[in-house]
Amino acid sequence: FSFERIDLHLDENKKQSIVQNCKDRNYTSFGKYNVERVETIDGFKFFFDDDTWLMIRASGTEPVLRTYSESSSQEKCFDILEDTRKTLLD
């Protein structure tokens, strides 16, 4: 398995808006990755149907969202993180 992280630097209002959307369970997919279930311990961990996951954690000290992914390959991890970036910011 591969594990990757990308930090999204954005303004505080956008960060809080995304966190609220996570709390409200407004994200049912990130690009082609459909959310099967969500855990809310230490952030928002979205599990997909193919043994992969994505975690979104808001920094408590700066306007940053940290996104983490685990998958069977590094390429797929980065694909998940890119689809996540597009979903959250576009």
What function would you assign to each model-found segment?
Residues F1-D90:
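Phosphate-binding and adjacent anionic-ligand microenvironments
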